[in-house]
């Protein structure tokens, strides 16, 4: 899992049927920008929790996605 900040959204007029109805966000992580499928209704400026890789594809019923926003982070603290 990774934490990132939503910096924008991605729109498309046409996309694969398996992505129909999906919203995509641009998320800045410590490793750079990623495009992630949004499952929680996050918006610009929100700090979010991402799952990536094979877990992300399984979470979206094997849709061809590399990252999924699964939570909006309310706060963090050091152990």
Where are these regions (language model features)?
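Generic structural signal for buried aliphatic residues
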Residues: 11, 48-49
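Short beta-strand-to-turn element immediately C-terminal to the catalytic PLP-Schiff-base lysine
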Residues: 27-29, 51
């Amino acid at each position: 899992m990774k934490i990132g900040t939503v910096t924008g959204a991605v729109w498309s007029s046409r996309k694969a049927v398996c992505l129909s109805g999906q919203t995509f966000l641009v998320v800045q992580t410590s490793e750079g920008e990623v495009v992630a499928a949004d499952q929680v209704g996050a918006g610009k400026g929100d700090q979010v929790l991402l799952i990536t890789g094979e877990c992300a594809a399984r979470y979206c019923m094997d849709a061809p996605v590399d990252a999924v926003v699964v939570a909006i982070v309310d706060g963090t603290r050091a152990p």
